[in-house]
UniProtKB/Swiss-Prot annotation:
Subunit-level organization: Monomer.
Family: Belongs to the Nth/MutY family.
Name of the featured protein: Adenine DNA glycosylase
Classification via PANTHER family: ADENINE DNA GLYCOSYLASE
The keyword DNA repair belongs to this UniProt entry's keyword annotation: yes
UniProt source species: Haemophilus influenzae (strain ATCC 51907 / DSM 11121 / KW20 / Rd)
GO BP, sorted A to Z: base-excision repair; mismatch repair
Sites annotated Transition state stabilizer: 143
Record-level Gene Ontology MF annotations: 4 iron, 4 sulfur cluster binding; 8-oxo-7,8-dihydroguanine DNA N-glycosylase activity; adenine/guanine mispair binding; metal ion binding; oxidized purine DNA binding; purine-specific mismatch base pair DNA N-glycosylase activity
E.C. number: 3.2.2.31
Length: 378
């Protein structure tokens, strides 16, 4: 599990020489490094590009300057700042891990590898990245960029997500990572993957490893790593009810598990007739269909059909008798218990700090534009 190479080994020497000239050294989390800041950045960078992460990281650090501040925040506050970054389980795990550090480590981020790895949302590579970056502990990493560099350099066949291929790549990253200057080396490997050995159109002529890179020698870089076996993306449909009363909109909070867990969303229906039946029950006769759109998750497409209606009754949705939340019955991720869901009238003109699913946020912005004729402050 530890780094095994010498700093003078050809691979490490070439990587570090490149880093000294071209590596990224001015990212926000690289300045005045702390375990908390690097941990936060590493979690945000999981499946998300650096340019996207930077503004989110800066907002988080400003709002929650230390791990205790994050732990003491409500989940709604955390999800609110995460809105738009996607993969919301990361935010929930981040919050859960912060509370564990507060409660079990007196608010001090652990420096033991096993303890870091045991935190919610932290895998082996993330734990190694945190401890190597801040404390220069000799732990290798294996994120997507590093996988690509190693797969091409050593011509490792197979999809990098396959267990036996991943194990092979772990053995290789242990082999090439030096026991000193580990922080610089790991950052360099990520930078080479992001800036030179890119997924498409790699700049092989500029790569410090091209002399011995097998994919470069054989001019077949596109073979490594092999693509994930393709499966057809399922297509699903849902109907959003944008139910307005006195300029406010009814939202409900989803269960913590599953898609959009813990976020506030519009009431959802599996089909249009169910939605219209609910409106009829509430004696709402006028509605407006807004343009449909597609939201794509990592494993399926969701076609969203928004329907807008105004409600004159003083009753909020939780007082309705109709169980309108039998949503997407064939999809466990979309099942919800009406009686346990948290619902309230949300004022987009004076928004509360809650987490919103990105399609919901976009529709609320459209609601403000339609209702008030101006841009939203969301």
């Amino acid at each position: 599990m530890l780094a095994k190479s010498s700093i003078n080994a050809p691979f490490a020497k070439s990587v570090l020489a490149w880093y000294d000239k071209f590596g990224r050294k001015h990212l926000p989390w690289q300045q005045n490094k702390t375990l908390y800041g690097v941990w936060l950045s590493e979690v945000m960078l999981q499946q998300t590009q650096v340019a996207t992460v930077i503004p989110y990281f800066e907002r988080f650090i400003k709002t929650f300057p230390n791990i205790t501040a994050l732990a003491n925040a409500s989940q709604d506050e955390v999800l609110h700042l995460w809105t738009g970054l996607g993969y919301y389980a990361r935010a929930r795990n981040l919050h859960k891990a912060a509370q564990k550090v507060r409660d079990e480590f007196n608010g001090n981020f652990p420096t033991n590898f096993e303890q870091v790895w045991a935190l919610s949302g932290v895998g082996r590579s993330t734990a190694g990245a945190i401890l190597s970056s801040v404390l220069n502990q000799p732990y290798p990493i294996l994120d997507g960029n590093v996988k690509r560099v190693l797969a091409r350099y050593f011509a490792v066949e197979g999809w990098s997500g396959e267990k036996k291929v991943e194990n092979r790549l772990w053995a290789l990253t242990e082999q090439v990572t030096p026991t000193t200057r580990v922080a610089d080396f790991n950052q360099a490997m990520m930078d080479i993957g992001a800036m030179v050995c890119m997924r498409t159109k790699p700049k092989c002529d500029l790569c410090p490893l091209n002399i011995d890179c097998l994919a470069y020698k054989n001019t077949n870089w596109e073979k490594f790593p092999a693509k994930k076996p393709k499966k057809a993306m399922p297509e699903k449909t849902t109907y959003f009810l944008i139910l307005s009363k006195n300029g406010k909109v009814c939202l409900e909070q989803r269960e913590n598990s599953g898609l959009w867990g813990g976020l506030f969303c519009f009431p959802q229906f599996e089909d249009k007739s169910s939605l219209l039946h609910f409106l009829a029950q509430e004696k709402v006769t006028h509605y407006q269909e807004w343009p449909s759109f597609r939201h794509t998750f990592s494993h399926f497409h969701l076609d969203i059909h928004p329907i807008y209606a105004e409600m004159e009754s003083t009753l909020c949705v939780e007082q309705a008798n109709l169980d309108w939340r039998k949503v997407m019955e064939s999809t466990k991720e979309y099942q919800s218990n009406l009686s346990s869901a948290v619902k309230y009238w949300y004022d987009p003109q004076n928004p509360e700090p809650i987490g919103l699913a990105q399609p919901v946020k976009n529709l609320l912005i459209q609601f403000v534009r339609n209702h008030y004729g101006k841009n939203s402050i969301l």
